[in-house]
């Protein structure tokens, strides 16, 4: 296919137009008075959301060059979401501000390489200062406040704080759709390990790219499955029962994997294969843990067991299994409570006896997975559209809370970014490097400016007033008061704020140093030739 090229100012202006279209759509959702965005769906009713990354992913522009600019900023939102789980709108706002100011200066003749260096220096200083003013999460109230700010709902904040209290800060918390209209919390016995599906064609939910199995059989083995004939008798028995299957094995490759995928795609039966967690002797122990939880027998040569001879009664079962590209979560395993209790006691004895800190840490992880369980937040709403929107909010709040536990929290509402301006302004460089620093200084004001704009106020006036306030005092757009944001419970996780700034600066710096853009040239499809009019034949037979 032929390519179309644009250079220098032409290329950058087109990409900036794409950046603006995406960012202007996303930034309307920022803050407690942010608006919603309605997304058209190919099937079913439109989706209403205020989730930055969901909106960014949905935007495709007709112009190839503009679309590339939009996609680069969408990448900022996605990366921030992957690292911190929240802060995608803030990241988009920061990226747009840095790119726009940078483009102005590059167009005026500044050296983009010098500007990039200045952006990197300023970002590093801002991140350092964010860590200095960060507070550790030391109470259930702080957890509830972080979650409440992210979800814009105090009840959600309390729910997430309760969930973390029950399963621990590192425990497994999942968000599911409820059949009723109330949102509630329940804790079920379950386990999560860090192995995802071996093929993306095994997913059942294409939007979230995860596989959900209800009441599946679970085959656990330390063997490699390469030949489908090894498990064919077992698969035939499972197909007859019409149940799903989770395979946990050393590996599934050769002809076995494509055969399983083909049967999944054809709808013969629902199957997901994952690699066994851990390595060496630790892997054997973890497989035994999973087997105890699910009531399975580990198919291993150590016990003289072969895959060809495996029967259904050697398989485990569970109420639900969810597999993502990175993790597998088993909920409501059918193992006997006495066997699980015995296994837990055995691990506790090993913890007491071990002299290695590393071994103790790994044993405690296993204990938490066996004994801690999984907290499930069941989201309820009156309509399906509201349900999806609520679920997005709770998932964001949960991610934000985990981020706060990890790196602490800072004053919310964009106040922390203004609080670091003084430190960044103290940097003194020359020429275009200083220009890059000044660009970041201006961008740090942008989240507060946008929150104020969304609340119907003049953003620049609010920014100047926040600058004149003591550290951590800012504008609460929810009630219109000026107050200490920490004391008012308006908190942002440090990790979220840091990731948003770092990712925005990274992509912005790359765009500013772009000198050429290559895109596919649109094909000119000529109109098909019109059919000949029979009457033009003059009645010829």
UniProtKB/Swiss-Prot annotation:
Keyword Cell division: no
Keyword Chaperone: yes
E.C. no: 5.6.1.7
GO MF entry, a single one: isomerase activity
Record keywords: ATP-binding, Chaperone, Cytoplasm, Isomerase, Nucleotide-binding
Region (Disordered): 521-541
Top enzyme class: isomerase
Transmembrane segments: none
Binding site for ATP: 29-32, 86-90, 413, 476-478, 492
Catalytic activity: ATP + H2O + a folded polypeptide = ADP + phosphate + an unfolded polypeptide
GO cellular component, one term: cytoplasm
Compartments (UniProt record): Cytoplasm
An annotated GO BP: protein refolding
Subunit structure: Forms a cylinder of 14 subunits composed of two heptameric rings stacked back-to-back. Interacts with the co-chaperonin GroES.
Functional note: Together with its co-chaperonin GroES, plays an essential role in assisting protein folding. The GroEL-GroES system forms a nano-cage that allows encapsulation of the non-native substrate proteins and provides a physical environment optimized to promote and accelerate protein folding.
NCBIfam families: GroEL, PRK00013.1, PRK12849.1, PRK12850.1, PRK12851.1
Assigned protein family: Belongs to the chaperonin (HSP60) family.
PANTHER family hit by this protein: 60 KDA HEAT SHOCK PROTEIN, MITOCHONDRIAL
Protein name according to UniProt: Chaperonin GroEL
Originating species: Latilactobacillus sakei subsp. sakei (strain 23K)
């Amino acid at each position: 296919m032929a390519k179309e090229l644009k250079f220098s100012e032409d290329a950058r202006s087109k990409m900036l137009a794409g950046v603006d279209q995406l960012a202007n759509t996303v930034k309307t959702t920022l803050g407690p008075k942010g608006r919603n965005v309605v997304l058209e769906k190919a099937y079913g009713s439109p989706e209403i959301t205020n989730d930055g990354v969901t909106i960014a992913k949905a935007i495709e522009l007709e112009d190839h060059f503009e679309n590339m600019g939009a996609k680069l900023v969408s990448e900022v939102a996605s990366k921030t979401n992957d690292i911190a789980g929240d802060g995608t709108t803030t990241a988009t706002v920061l990226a747009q501000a840095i790119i726009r100011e940078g483009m102005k200066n590059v167009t005026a003749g500044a050296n983009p390489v010098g500007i990039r260096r200045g952006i990197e220096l300023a970002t590093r200083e801002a991140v350092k200062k964010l860590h200095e003013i960060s507070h550790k999460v030391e109470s259930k109230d702080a957890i509830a406040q972080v979650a409440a700010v992210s979800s814009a709902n105090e009840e959600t904040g309390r729910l997430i704080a309760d969930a973390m209290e029950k399963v621990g800060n590192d425990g497994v918390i999942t968000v599911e759709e409820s059949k009723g209209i109330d949102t509630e919390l329940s804790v079920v016995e379950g386990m999560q390990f860090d192995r995802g599906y071996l093929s993306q064609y095994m997913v059942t939910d294409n939007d979230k790219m995860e596989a959900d199995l209800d009441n599946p059989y679970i085959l656990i083995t330390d063997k490699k499955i390469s030949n489908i004939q090894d498990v064919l008798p077992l698969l035939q028995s499972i197909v007859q029962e019409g149940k799903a299957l989770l395979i946990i094995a050393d590996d599934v490759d050769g002809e076995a994997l494509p055969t399983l995928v083909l049967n999944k795609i054809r709808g013969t039966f629902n199957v997901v294969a994952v690699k066994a967690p851990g390595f060496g002797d630790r892997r054997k122990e973890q497989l035994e843990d999973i087997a105890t939880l699910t009531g399975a027998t580990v198919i291993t040569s150590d016990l003289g067991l072969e895959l060809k001879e495996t029967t259904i009664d050697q398989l485990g079962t569970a109420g639900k299994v969810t597999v993502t590209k990175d993790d597998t979560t088993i909920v409501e395993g059918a193992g006997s409570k006495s066997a699980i209790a015995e296994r837990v006691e055995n691990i506790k004895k090993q913890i007491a006896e071990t002299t290695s800190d590393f071994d103790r840490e790994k044993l405690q992880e296993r204990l938490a997975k066996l004994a801690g369980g999984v907290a499930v937040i069941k989201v309820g709403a009156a309509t399906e559209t509201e349900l999806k929107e609520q679920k997005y909010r709770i998932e964001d709040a949960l991610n934000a809370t985990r981020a706060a536990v990890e790196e602490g929290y800072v004053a919310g509402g964009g106040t922390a970014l203004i609080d670091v301006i003084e430190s960044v302004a103290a940097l003194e460089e020359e020429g275009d490097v200083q220009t890059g620093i000044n660009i970041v200084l201006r961008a740090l004001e942008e989240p507060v400016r946008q929150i104020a704009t969304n609340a119907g106020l003049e953003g620049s006036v609010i920014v100047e007033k926040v600058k004149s306030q003591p550290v951590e005092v800012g504008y609460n757009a929810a009630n219109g008061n000026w107050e200490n944001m920490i004391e008012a419970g308006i908190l942002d996780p440090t990790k979220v704020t840091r990731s948003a700034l770092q990712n925005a600066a990274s992509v912005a710096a790359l765009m500013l140093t772009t000198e050429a853009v290559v895109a596919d040239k649109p094909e000119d499809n000529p109109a098909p030739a019109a059919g000949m009019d029979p009457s033009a034949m003059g009645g010829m037979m």
